[in-house]
Amino acid sequence: MDHIRNFSIIAHIDHGKSTLADRIIQVCGGLADREMEAQVLDSMDIERERGITIKAQTAALSYRARDGKVYNLNLIDTPGHVDFSYEVSRSLSACEGALLVVDASQGVEAQTVANCYTAIELGVEVVPVLNKIDLPAANPENAIEEIEDVIGIDATDATRCSAKTGLGVEDVLESLIAKVPPPKGDPAAPLQALIIDSWFDNYVGVVMLVRIVNGTLRPKEKIKMMATGAQYPVEHVGVFTPKSRNLESLSAGQVGFIIAGIKELTAAKVGDTVTHVAKAASEPLPGFKEVKPQVFAGLYPVEANQYDALRESLEKLKLNDASLQYEPEVSQALGFGFRCGFLGLLHMEIVQERLEREFDMDLITTAPTVVYEVVQSDGSTIMVENPAKMPEPGRIAEVREPIVTVNLYMPQDYVGSVITLCEQKRGSQINMQYHGRQVQLTYEIPMAEIVLDFFDRLKSVSRGYASMDYEFKEYRSSDVVKVDMLINGDKVDALSIIVHRSQSQYRGREVAAKMREIIPRQMYDVAIQAAIGAHIVARENIKALRKNVLAKCYGGDITRKKKLLEKQKEGKKRMKQVGSVEIPQEAFLAILRVEDK
């Protein structure tokens, strides 16, 4: 066991994490040169295109060090984005060490820090590495100062490398072997294995990626999950060298996979502990928690007959994404669809994109909302994740909205504009620190404000230099109201929004004005109204298209003209009673694009 090293790589988006992983695999000969491709461990197309890692992947590599010994290195690739922070903490708790990759030309950024603190809390040894030192803009001294200043770990002897050219990659492995301790654990103790990740394979069912903490596991033994108590016979165990390879057994300290003919992904929850049925461990490994969705949106098929296809696609996605939740929902305006829960905005975009790309779905998405805690006047508390389910104003005693703590990092030139943005979003400042040229701001902001367009606007006010990460803090009482949109007096449920009272009139007016531009003119007048309860806060009219019925009258008596106009008026009135207004797809997106003033 002294020759095993389990490590993962922590980095901000675009700091070269996946490229470094590729180089390490190449140096260790995990894949032949002809099988090498960029970003070996990012298996989904969408991961490659966006240049992000979503699912955790592993590679078991062997490396002959300069002291002549052969070491087994287990690389566990972690997602870097804030939405997947639970997956990151699971991946990290399976390691003894982490390479902290910092771009020498850009310095430390928000997600690096967030994941790095997670690593330090879990007691993982952090080894700093400066990447991209072949760039003309690289400034390693500055980067080292920032690492020491912001994160507070000694980085004077940080290894310098360039993952792109392969320069210094062996030095990285050497310092990894020197600084990271070998795994502890007893191969003879009762089995405890931590599930780092799980995914669905069409041929063998669920594949679980595990780190064996104690004990030994062989095929044909019976295992059980400690969170659910379900039992399964093991079919195969093995490791990935990115390609899978079956082994006779997995023992303490190793990272590998278990295939046990499990049909549902929900049975193999990330962070759960696997143990033997016969000789069970007395307690599970710490740190398991159920992941709760934070952001909800309605997904509807454009064609009503695609509903079943959408349900099947969601079921298939759920196989590979246990944190996705969905339930059927009916909307008068959009027909049948699903209310889906996501971990965050990026997660939502990815699910939508995968549905459109892998399953060829055409979707309408309603505005994303967060979960509100509503105390009703009879004292009961309900969770509301859909504006349509919000009770009438008279039945509500108090509404609490989720507040998140946001950490922002940016160069000091942009502090002013970022603070202005946070104030607009009803944020309250908690802390502000200067680290050299970088500034760290901490704000508490309602989650609902972040869901809409906070990230995009942060990038635009800081010219792309600011980075952020957020975590849920608490529910806090707030004065929020539901704004309904009425078209000719009928509520359109899919257009309801929940906003803070201070912005409700403005948002109602804006949405009404937007809809006036978007809804095509009808043969009769259409009134668009925004209402809070029974109180109308805004109104826009779409004038009717009309035919000039007087064109054929030439001269003649006024009563003749009056008669024709009256007849037209009657016809329009009749039409208005039977007609219904078609609402185009853009109207639903219009809500998203309303900016706060």
UniProtKB/Swiss-Prot annotation:
Biological role: Required for accurate and efficient protein synthesis under certain stress conditions. May act as a fidelity factor of the translation reaction, by catalyzing a one-codon backward translocation of tRNAs on improperly translocated ribosomes. Back-translocation proceeds from a post-translocation (POST) complex to a pre-translocation (PRE) complex, thus giving elongation factor G a second chance to translocate the tRNAs correctly. Binds to ribosomes in a GTP-dependent manner.
Catalytic activity entry: GTP + H2O = GDP + phosphate + H(+)
Similarity comment: Belongs to the TRAFAC class translation factor GTPase superfamily. Classic translation factor GTPase family. LepA subfamily.
Domain of life (superkingdom): Bacteria
Membrane topology note: Peripheral membrane protein
EC number: 3.6.5.n1
PROSITE patterns tied to this protein: G_TR_1, G_TR_2
Chief location of this protein within or outside the cell: membrane
SMART domains reported in the protein's UniProt record: EFG_C
Sequence ranges assigned to domain tr-type G in this UniProt record: 2-184
GO MF annotation terms: GTP binding; GTPase activity; guanosine tetraphosphate binding; ribosome binding; translation elongation factor activity
Residues the entry annotates as binding GTP: D14, H15, G16, K17, S18, T19, N131, K132, I133, D134
Keyword check for Cell membrane: yes
Record-linked Pfam families: EFG_C, GTP_EFTU, GTP_EFTU_D2, LepA_C
Record protein name field: Elongation factor 4
Compartmental location: Cell inner membrane
GO biological process, any: positive regulation of translation
GO cellular component terms, A-Z: plasma membrane
Keywords annotated in UniProt: Cell inner membrane, Cell membrane, GTP-binding, Hydrolase, Membrane, Nucleotide-binding, Protein biosynthesis
Keyword 4Fe-4S: no
